[in-house]
A protein has these predicted regions:
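Low-complexity acidic/polar repeat-biased segments
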Residues: 88-109
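Short, aromatic/His-centered strand-loop micro-motif at the edge of beta-sheets
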Residues: 82-88
Length: 109
């Protein structure tokens, strides 16, 4: 398997209903699975992903502050098989991250 790819697994375990929306007005936010975080702070915000996610856990992040410096912090888990945080460098970005496994970590869906 190549980095950034994954084989089929049941990722549908947390698909019941819509995510709970949380308006972020601070520079830091600890994320919970099943939540959508809308970044509205005048300064860049960092959303830190859960430290011990289960396969199928998901987090939405939506940029609403028109900045290109907001960050999704990996909190010890990979994002798309990379051991690095993700900068949301689009002022209109909206991303969903779903946890796959310990090797791949969080994937963009």
């Amino acid at each position: 398997m190549n980095p950034g790819t994954f084989a089929g697994t049941n990722f549908g375990t947390n698909l019941s209903g819509s995510p709970t929306m949380n308006i972020v007005t601070a520079t830091a936010q600890m994320a919970l699975s099943g939540y959508q975080y809308v970044l509205t702070n005048a300064s860049a915000s960092t959303v830190t992903l859960p430290a011990t996610p289960a396969p199928g856990d998901y987090v939405y992040v939506t940029v609403a502050n028109n900045l290109v410096t907001n960050t999704v912090a990996r909190n010890g888990n990979n994002i798309m098989s990379l051991a690095q945080d993700m900068t949301l460098d689009n002022p209109y970005a909206g991303v969903q991250l779903r946890y796959a496994n310990a090797t791949i970590g969080w994937v963009l869906t």
